[in-house]
Amino acid sequence: GEKDNGWSTSMLLTHWQGDGYADGTFGQGQTYFLSLGYKMNDKHNFNFLMTGAPQWHDQNFTKSIATYLERGRKYNNNYGYYGDQYLTERRNFYHKPVFNLNWDFTIDEKSSLSTVLYASTGNGGGTGNRGNRIRTEDGYIDYDAIYAYNLSTSGAGGAYGAAEGGYVTRSSMNMHNWFGLVTNYETELSDNLSFNVGADLRT
């Protein structure tokens, strides 16, 4: 709640993680929220807000019913091991925090101005495969064999770096920076009529 000096604070922090229903569908993430408010006087009220939810989770792409009948419902052919290290070719990851600075200005009993300055910076995406997989007998990706094969190639040419029949894990990225300002002025002209005008600026 608001203290006698006009300041108020609210915050939240959570964490989750799990291994999913299907094999090779691990994931984890956090959620955070911070709000700082300051009521300068009866006319001016400020609030700063920051929130975000970084996360990553591994995926299980579509397969035929025949494959599930053969391998089981939890079968996932998008992961494997390099030595004893778990690796996946299908991972989604993202973090897009949002920052707001709000200013509420009570001009008089009939007029008010509300302004929000905001920013959102984020990046994320998903991984996938390019090239020829090598699989183990039980249907998982054989990263040891892939590593050995890739070493035997010259590394020249090939689409997306998968040269001479080799294999790579690629990442499709989405990166952006949003900045903007939203402001709204409202005044009461009479008991039955009000005037409202605003602006929405963004980059």
What are these language model-derived features?
Residues 1-17, 22-58, 101-108:
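Transmembrane beta-barrel wall of Gram-negative outer-membrane proteins
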Residues 7-9, 13, 37-41, 66, ...:
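Short, surface-exposed, polar/charged, turn-prone segments marking secondary-structure boundaries
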Residues 8-17, 70-84, 154-166:
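Flexible, solvent-exposed coil segments and beta strand-coil junctions
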Residues 13, 27, 33, 84-88, ...:
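Short, well-ordered helical secondary-structure segments
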Residues 18, 22-23, 39, 43-97, ...:
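Flexible loop and strand-edge segments within Gram-negative outer membrane beta-barrel domains
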Residues 27-32, 62-74, 130-140, 203:
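Flexible, surface-exposed loop regions and adjacent strand-edge segments
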Residues 94-203:
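Face-selective signature of the C-terminal outer-membrane beta-barrel domain
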